[in-house]
Amino acid sequence: MRRSSLVLAAALLAFAAGVPARPLHDLSRADTATDALVAAHGLPGASLRLATGAGEVHRRHVGSHGEATRVPIASASKWLSALTLARLVEAGELRWDDPVGDYFPEAPAAVRGITIDQLFSHTSGIATEEAACLSARGVTLQQCALEILAQPLAWAPGNVFAYGGNSMQVAGAMAERATGRSWDAIFLAEMVAPLGLTGTDWTAAALREGYVPNANPRIAGGARSTLADYSRVVDMVLAGGDVAGEAFLSPQTLAVMARDRTLGLPIADSPDTRTDQGYGLGQWVEARDVHGATTRVSSPGAFGFTPWVDWRQGSNGVLLVQGNGRAMREDINALQRACLDALEPVRELQHASPPALPGPRAAPVRLDATGRAH
């Protein structure tokens, strides 16, 4: 606290004397790493935005990128989908432990006991080889889910971590049956309207402007988004679920989502860049404290788009790029490290807390599809 006071006092004195205060964060390494990433991988551009509990501290576009740049985000879609389901859970329309059989009684007996929690943590036992229906035209989400459920299980549910998108497709279809609404309608009501998203939908390959509907959205990897939109998402997560002082989600729900589901489980299938990390619900667990509580989460995509939230440090970041994510991953990790290092010296000035340790708060105020509280 004493050091924080000295830092703030020095800045105020410099301002009063007409001398420019030293920037609170030196992000020159991050800027250099961003430029190097673009050059090394022949990217058309890149966008980087960083924030702390006090607000945005850095936003930069390189090359052809700008505020309107919209890209497919691949597996960063998983985090959006998980947050969408979390809204339904808090509204009482779903539970994380709801089994498949409650919504698909016609499914084979072997899969009826699989829960939404397992479907969204890659522990369902469903095979990871991509189902053909994920990319099929003229197929609905319901039809795709039934096709996936009809296949033999690769592992016993809850016994193995195996990364893949098939299981999340089933969870999305369960949400449709639970609410009686399409995934598009759910997403528009639970994410787009209350968060003020203007460039995010589930048609990754589309070139049209606006929100383009999709009868069979790829729940685990089919979204496209912008720097501004995803920044709103990670700002909400960093703030423990708050949006402009009102509860979008509770800290308890975010803590449940961030809990590592891979502990004690054999790893049957995982991206080669993520073998040392855990997994929660739609998000990777990148760091933990000495007690094992999650302190940093992320959801990088195959094309390089990388969002993260670090509760211990009180910071978040979104890197928007489109290229070969596997080839870029080492350089992206170095860029993320440069960002975290730049924000680290002043972490005591931030006020964000891990959602596992929520402070006292008033009863949650839920935002509806129009942004009104109720």
Task: Give the location of each predicted region.
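Active-site helix/loop module of the DD-peptidase/beta-lactamase fold
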Residues: 67, 72-76, 88-131, 150, ...
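Active-site SXXK
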Residues: 34, 48, 54, 71-97, ...
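Flexible glycine/proline-enriched surface loops and loop-helix/loop-strand junctions
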Residues: 65-68, 151-157, 167-169, 211-219, ...
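A short, well-structured edge-of-sheet supersecondary motif
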Residues: 35-66, 96, 134, 138, ...
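Active-site-proximal alpha-helical segments within enzyme catalytic domains
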Residues: 119-122, 167-174, 219-243, 252-254, ...
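Short, gly/Ser/Thr-rich active-site loops of penicillin-recognizing serine hydrolases
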Residues: 326-374
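Active-site Gly/Thr loop motif
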Residues: 199-221, 225-228, 258-318, 349, ...
